[in-house]
Every structure is written in C-alpha cells, then in structure tokens.
Amino acid sequence: MEIVRLSLFGNPNIGVYVFANNSIALVPPSLSSGEKKVIAETLDVELVETKIANTILNGVLVVGNDNGIILPRIILDEELDILNNNLKKHDLNIYVSRSKNTALGNILLCNNKACIAGSELERQELNKISEALGVEALYKDIMNLTIPGSLAVVTDKGGVIHPDISDDENRELKEIFKVAFERATVNSGIPFIKSGLIANNKGIIVGEYTTGPEILRIRRGLSGGAI
C-alpha cells in the first residue's frame, strides 16, 4: 500500500480538506495540479472538485463510505448540483443531514462495515445515515469525547486511533468495524489523527510533518487486514 507525505495550502493538516472513499475524493477546487495528481494516484480515485458550504473544509463537513456520502445541512445548492452530477456514475447515495451538527467528519466514523456517531447526533439522523450508508450505525463516544471521527481513521483493512484510547475501547472498536486499530499520532505528535491523514483501501496520504516512526505505525494500522 502506497503512503506519501503531503501538505495542502501549505498546511500539513490535510485531513480537514479532503473526503475520500474507494472511488472518489472530494477536494477543494483551488488545489494545484501536482497536489491533485498525488491524491488521485495514491488513492486511485476520481477527483471531484467542490467546496462544501462555501468552505474548503471538505474533510470536516463530509463523511461516508462506498455506499453513500453524508452532507451537512449548510451545503449550497450549487455544490449539491456538482455532487449529484458527478457522483451518479458511482451509484452513491447522497443524504443531506438535517442535524444541527455540521462537522459530520468529526462526529461520525465509518467504513463499509459499520458507522459510529458521537452521542450529540440526533436519533432520527442516526437512522437516516445508517440507511444511506448501508451499514449499522450506533452511538459510541470515544474517550468520553463525542467526536470519534476526529480521533480515528478506519478503512476496510484496518484503523488508526488516538494513542490514549483504553484497551477496552480499542477492543470494542475492533468488534464494531471488524478490523484492528493501531494507536498512532500524525504530524510529529498530533493525537487527533484524522487531521493529518487521508486514506482508503488502496493508499495512504499523511501530513508533511509526519515522522518515519509515525508512518510505520500508520501503515501497520491501515494495512492490518479484515478479521
């Protein structure tokens, strides 16, 4: 599995800017051609260029898997049109959440087997998200924090997570997502690993300040294999 370092907009916190599954990546329209090439080739995905809610924080505001994507209620009509037009061929469900929580990439953590949500998400939204993504969705705070999506990254091969997670919680996540999670940091010690990491089943992109030992742990976690 290929793993590369990257900064976007001069910032190693690349995970806040990009949402990716195994077929597409939603990227801000202002990326350079070189940056877009790295993302497309490393993850082996088609790029869809769009802002979300007139921001470049696609990784914070969007969540999903290979069955669907979940968008915040503050998305603009013209942005939704771009997504509808570009995602038809990928047969993705598109659901615009009505949740008061708009940072969906932080409050939700999903792969193609399960989805967990922080306890602040409304019950009716959890049910609709489960339907759109085609997986069981359940409430699960991590480390007493309601932002599981910012604490971890998970694919269908493995996961990486905040280094302070307890053994018991780590085992619970393994049971839910059917993959093992490796404790790791990114960008020279940042424990909120989503901020500096973009990954799918085919490739891994880490923030430019990620160290060699961090890369080894991230690679081990995301190459772990389904159980």
Swiss-Prot record:
It comes from the Archaea. The keyword Protein biosynthesis applies. One of its GO terms (biological process) is cytosolic ribosome assembly. The keyword Protein biosynthesis applies. GO terms for molecular function: ribosome binding; translation initiation factor activity. Belongs to the eIF-6 family. Binds to the 50S ribosomal subunit and prevents its association with the 30S ribosomal subunit to form the 70S initiation complex. NCBIfam families: eIF-6. This is Translation initiation factor 6. It comes from Staphylothermus marinus (strain ATCC 43588 / DSM 3639 / JCM 9404 / F1).
